[in-house]
Amino acid sequence: VARNIPPAPGEPRRPFGPRDSGDAWVEGERGRFWGRYGAAGLLAWDPSRGVLLQHRAEWSDQGGTWGLPGGALHAGEGAIDGALREAHEEAAVPAGQLKPWVMSTFSVGYWSYTTVVAEVLAPFEPQMNDSESIALEWVPVESVSSAPLHPGFEASWPSLRPLLGRQPQLVVDAANVVGSRPDGWWRDRFGAAERLRDRLDALAVAGVAAEAASGLLWSPDILMVVEGRARGVSNSAHVRVVDAPGEGDNEIVDQVAALIAGQAKQDVTVITSDRELAARVEDLGGRVHGAAWLTERIDAVTDR
């Protein structure tokens, strides 16, 4: 059984607006944790400088240790939005210069903390915006474990470090996925492809659970290959659409080969139930999941 602990009189307030209802302790059988609706932190990684760490003020919980910018989520706020908001409030981190790609969640049932891992696309210098920090520094990856770390971050760092630099890519065989459900798609192939693109867009925002019970949700780059009468579908915020000039299978193989050759730590997964195409992708070093694997995850997001 969990219970909320009201804020103590005189606790420091946020510099941006009044205290939020999420700024409170939650207590249960696993201990006391900050954030009525859970909490989130940002692990910002700059390939040339390392990760951004916050030296926590002595008055704060686990004061004097090094950890991630972050804090309590607002009611109804997603982990990515919350982590970016907190990092901006505490360290002036510009959300537009980051690319979040994976979320790692620790949960005790009545409370959870999500680490949002993001790559820095354009360099920036953090600034201490409130009294929660003694210092903000870019720390080389190999030096992180040498610092006196916040216990939660210290426990999670060994599993977070291997995620740095990974670039998950999802390549979708649109014709195969659309054709896996007899919902009348053959009457309007273009419209069916647009609907799939929109559902993929929602999945990218919510995150893709790659493995059961892993605690990881990925935000991959999504490439959707269309063919025939489905050609001409436009890109969306999170989905890039490629028109296959001929057979979609050949275009998918070409795209996979280019992605794998482009960066050593890219993880390329193709969604198709076509066995011949799957074998060609695996020969290149890519992973393959069937259409049902994707539609189950899309349904879990879009049917909420």
Where does each model-flagged region fall?
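Nuclease catalytic cores that cleave nucleic-acid phosphodiester bonds
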Residues: 166-172, 176-304
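Short beta-strand scaffold segments in enzyme catalytic cores
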Residues: 40-44, 116
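A conserved beta-turn-beta hairpin within the catalytic core of GNAT-like acetyltransferases
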Residues: 60-64
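Entry beta-strands of beta-propeller and related beta-repeat scaffolds
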Residues: 50-51
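Short histidine-centered catalytic/ligand-binding loop motif
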Residues: 66-76, 185
